[in-house]
From Swiss-Prot:
On the 2D-gel the determined pI of this unknown protein is: 6.1, its MW is: 30.4 kDa. This is Unknown protein from spot 474 of 2D-PAGE of etiolated coleoptile. It comes from the Eukaryota.
């Protein structure tokens, strides 16, 4: 799972 903010 990858989140970039």
């Amino acid at each position: 799972i990858f989140f970039e903010v």
